[in-house]
Each structure stands twice: as structure tokens, then as C-alpha cells.
């Protein structure tokens, strides 16, 4: 089976607000399979936003596991992120999962990987996926040089990314806290 490429997920934290956005394209090889995938969702009674890049089945498994970790740790995103990364890296079955996650609550944002990375950004901006570097660059420029709020920054940065990255489209889903 061909590798499924897809997605740009971007989170922006600015002036006490947080937003996470993702595009809707799913591609297999050089074929666009879906235009309206939802790769950003709310967890933990709407208090946490999570987005994924990579295999959808793997990501949903990780979303479920992350939400269990949130419940176990009383909603602490940092503790749940570290515990998920630890389990993901050490468990033989989970190690095979191919996805990256961005998770955010009102106070913290993290990128979580299967190699054990739990990264909190210095500047409030995180991006993953095939268009991640384009989105990260555009968002950082907009954060530093405009008065736009996080949702507006994500919209502009993701549209720039969709114009450049063939695996990213303009069908955006953006969640805010």
C-alpha cells in the first residue's frame, strides 16, 4: 500500500488565545482521496484541542490514548503528553504508529512524537505535516508583524501553505479556546 501523505496542522498562541487549524486533504501517492477530512478535534470535554498529521487510524488510536492520559492526570496536558510519549515510545505495538500530534489547552501547547519528543514552543507557534515548515514560517511572520488574532493568523498562514504544498488544501477546520 502506498504511503498516505497529508496535512498541515498549525497552532498559534497569542495574547492569551489559542487556535489550532488543519486542512482537509488526504492524498495517497499522487491522488487526492478526500478534500474534507477533519484532523483537528476537541478532547476532554472541549478543554483540549488536538490535531494530527499522518495515518488517520494511528492518529485516532493516539487521540483515544491521549484522552485516557488526560483523565488519569486530571486534565494536565503536560503530564498527559509526557506519559503518552513514554508509552508510545516503549510499547511494541504503539511504536509502529505513524503520526504526529499537536495538543493544546488554554495554557500549554505541545508537539508529541513516537520517538519520545514532547516539544513546547518558545514563540507559541507549532506546525506539523507535509506543509508544516511553510505554515510555521508564515505564522511566525504574521505573529511578529501583525495584530491578527490566532484564528486569523492560522487562516492566512494555512492559505499560504495550501498555495505552496501539494498535500495541503484550502478546506480548513480551526478550533479555538
Swiss-Prot record:
What EC class does the entry list? hydrolase
**UniProt keyword terms in alphabetical order:** Allosteric enzyme, Cytoplasm, Hydrolase, Metal-binding, Protease, Sodium, Stress response, Threonine protease
Its Gene Ontology cellular component terms are: HslUV protease complex; proteasome core complex
Q: Which GO terms describe its biological process?
A: proteolysis involved in protein catabolic process
| Entry keyword Endoplasmic reticulum | no
Summarize the activity regulation.
Allosterically activated by HslU binding.
Report a single Gene Ontology molecular function. Answer: threonine-type endopeptidase activity
Q: How does it assemble?
A: A double ring-shaped homohexamer of HslV is capped on each side by a ring-shaped HslU homohexamer. The assembly of the HslU/HslV complex is dependent on binding of ATP.
Q: Which family does it belong to?
A: Belongs to the peptidase T1B family. HslV subfamily.
Q: What is the name of this protein?
A: ATP-dependent protease subunit HslV
- Could you tell me which species this protein originates from? Leptospira biflexa serovar Patoc (strain Patoc 1 / ATCC 23582 / Paris)
User: Lineage in the entry?
Assistant: Bacteria, Pseudomonadati, Spirochaetota, Spirochaetia, Leptospirales
Q: Which gene encodes it?
A: hslV
Amino acid at each position: 500500500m502506498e504511503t498516505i501523505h497529508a496535512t498541515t496542522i498549525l497552532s498559534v498562541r497569542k495574547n492569551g488565545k489559542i487556535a489550532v487549524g488543519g486542512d482537509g486533504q488526504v492524498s495517497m501517492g499522487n491522488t487526492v482521496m478526500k478534500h474534507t477530512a477533519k484532523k483537528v478535534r476537541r478532547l476532554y470535554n472541549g478543554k483540549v484541542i488536538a490535531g494530527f498529521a499522518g495515518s488517520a487510524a494511528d492518529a485516532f488510536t493516539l487521540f483515544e490514548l491521549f484522552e485516557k492520559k488526560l483523565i488519569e492526570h486530571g486534565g494536565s496536558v503536560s503530564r498527559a503528553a509526557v506519559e503518552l510519549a513514554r508509552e508510545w515510545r516503549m510499547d511494541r505495538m504503539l511504536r509502529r504508529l505513524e503520526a504526529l500530534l499537536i495538543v493544546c489547552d488554554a495554557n500549554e501547547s505541545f508537539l508529541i512524537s513516537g520517538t519520545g519528543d514532547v516539544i513546547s514552543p518558545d514563540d507559541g507557534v507549532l506546525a506539523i505535516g507535509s506543509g508544516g515548515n511553510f505554515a510555521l514560517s508564515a505564522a511566525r511572520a504574521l505573529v511578529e508583524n501583525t495584530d491578527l488574532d490566532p484564528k486569523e493568523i492560522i487562516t492566512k498562514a494555512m492559505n499560504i501553505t495550501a498555495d505552496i504544498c501539494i498535500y495541503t488544501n484550502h478546506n480548513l477546520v480551526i478550533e479555538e479556546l
